[in-house]
Amino acid sequence: MRTLRGPLRQPVRRLGLPQPLVVSVHGGDVRMNPISGTFRLKGHDDPEERKQALLEFLADEKEIYELFMVVDEELKMMCDICNEGGQVLGPFLKPMTHLVHTEYLLAGRTSRDVRDVLRDTMYAATVTGSPVENACRLIRRYESEGRGYYGAALALLGRDPQGRPTADSPIVIRTADVTVDGDLKVTAGATLVRDSDAAYEVAETRAKAGGILSAFGLVPRATTDSDAIAALARDEDVLLALGSRNQR
């Protein structure tokens, strides 16, 4: 395991929820999944009020350009590794237990070694900032202690039935680090841009941590019906609002 601040030496156990994709390579097909922008479900129990709040979120300039920033950074990575071209799909919604994210899917073709692809897609801009290299320098300069596993590079390497190399690498977020002494640490962050509101971003980090904390019984479980949220993600007005983002 290698982290943003180098190798991690403290013995810990990592427990977590399903992780968002950073990059995958299968048969030369490359996928990246830039994610940014967070709609908190808490406080939106009425279906109509929830829909209206989501539509306002999708039209929010700050949320739009926050995702664009991450997409732009990962597109630069894709342009470097995908010598056979690619495409951008989305935006889409990614419903979670306590929140809903906005995301794109980037797809392309490469002939490069999967290990090179992994190296050149470290680290996800949504957990470092942009440009990634400069952001990592600032993290090293201003953060007094390491982030542990949070935002680290994790990968599963293998081969497909035809013997071709494969790789799947997620963002290590929404996890809990548990030490041998039983201490538990959950890390969450938010993407800051010019129009960010400090109080809103703090509430966002609490919502992000809520999923893993509720799994441990440390905070109440989400009360929102997951089927209702999935249906909202397919709502025509919501789909139109998502599509209109690409007209900017």
Task: Describe each region flagged by the PLM.
Residues 3-6, 16, 32-34, 69-71, ...:
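General beta-strand structural signal in soluble alpha/beta enzymes
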Residues 5-8, 51-54, 138-139, 159-162:
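Short secondary-structure boundary micro-motifs
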Residues 10-12, 20, 55-59, 65-66, ...:
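Generic recognition of flexible, low-complexity loop/linker segments
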Residues 1-3, 10-12, 47-49, 128-129, ...:
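A short linear-motif detector with a strong N-terminal bias
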Residues 20-21, 28, 104-246:
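Conserved hydrophobic core element of enzyme catalytic domains
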Residues 1-21, 67, 74, 81, ...:
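Active-site pocket-lining segments that scaffold enzyme catalytic pockets across diverse folds
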Residues 24-99, 179-232:
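Cytosolic ligand/metal-binding cores
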Residues 10, 17, 61, 65, ...:
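Generic amphipathic alpha-helical segments used as scaffolds and interaction surfaces in large
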